[in-house]
Amino acid sequence: MMNFKHAMKVAVVAAVVVPATLDAQVRMTVPPQAEAVAIQGATIHTVTNGVIENGTIIFNDGIITSIGVNLDVPAGTRVVDGDGKHIYPGLIDAYSTVGISEIGAVDVSNDVNELGDFNPNVRADVAVNAESRHIGTSRSAGVLVAFSTPGGGLVSGMSSALSLEGWSWEEMSMESAAALNVNWPNPNPRRFRGFGGRGGPQEPPPSYEEQVQSLKSFFAEARAYRDAIAAGEEVRTDSRYAAMVSVFDGKIPVVVAADGAAQINDAVTWALEEDIEIVIRGGGDAIHVADRLVAHDIPVILTSTMAAPGRDYEGYDGAYTMPARLHEAGVRFAISGGAGSLYTNRLPWEAGVAVAFGLPEEEALKAVTINAAEFMGVADRVGSLEAGKQATFLITTGTPLDMTSDIEQSYIQGREIDMMDIQKFFFEKYMTKVMQYLRVVM
């Protein structure tokens, strides 16, 4: 039997040899930043403080220490030449299922939906698979932070802010409970006739009024629970109600999924009655209630810029021009890749389409960086390039919103990220096959 010392020697040899053979196939998790780094001569797009030409960014221990022009570089700092390159904040997907959804057709690889209508105690981060293939492809597209979001029911649970680098969900989680998610009922659902799998007729779904009343009752019960605890009363612990306290205390927003104008209007009325902060997610008809959204300073997370029109009479470019129209109307908004981890890596193209259809590029960049960070409560750490924030950024050949630009390197909290992903691996693998074949036949 192999003794312990021999086993350790084998493990050490494997640790040295295996990465050499697999690093092209598997993205490697890198250790925390170990030395100060200065990138000089790049064009730095801070998002909040303009563009710095021929600038320098210095970071240490995962934090930006200084940013500007002609900075003094401390002794011992590793200097990187950024001449001709651009530096942008890491992109942020405000609505994703990255890490909790892998293959749509394989149920056991999806951990998005919980049973029941009210699950505010559910947090996405505890279910995150840090080895998800979608993490690498998302980072290659420039997305370095994502809000992984549970679904199902009326109250789905908490979105978790994830930094897309780490060995485990604990290492990746920036904010475990960043926002509560509510799926606003649809007043005009499609009705289907048929029979259930057991041969009996399907039960009719609850009416719109019944669902809204159920939601209001749950919030009333949770508020009473919070008030009873605050008054020092002895109450039986309920994890669902306990999770709601941060909402009533104004510490986190409620993200309300609503697309239709009637849905959005009713959701806004409800939020005003509850005196809670909300963000509309979806917002397909947001432009039709723009005045009310502006009046109450309610932002929107658009979930699909690259979408077909939802109604026969709408123009083909209705979704494409929505960001530009909301911007003109004064509505604050972010752009997301849309539901599903598969779509997080198309986030820059969603914003790029908005630019092609009238949205100023600087506003599109804000929609996938600082706006998303502000709406979801992490703007003190990410979303722009400023001293004191995390060193989470991209080094590119041009704007990340343009498909012709290359993202040459990413840093997450100062870590120099392995840029390999599964799509690049298969591209290189089968290009090698083609080249080998050509050498044989030529």
Tell me what each language-model feature is.
Residues 29-31, 35, 44, 48-88:
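Histidine-rich, glycine-flanked metal-binding segment
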Residues 1-11:
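Bacterial N-terminal signal peptides that target proteins for export
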Residues 103-104, 109-115, 121, 253, ...:
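His/Asp/Glu-enriched, well-ordered alpha-helical/loop segment
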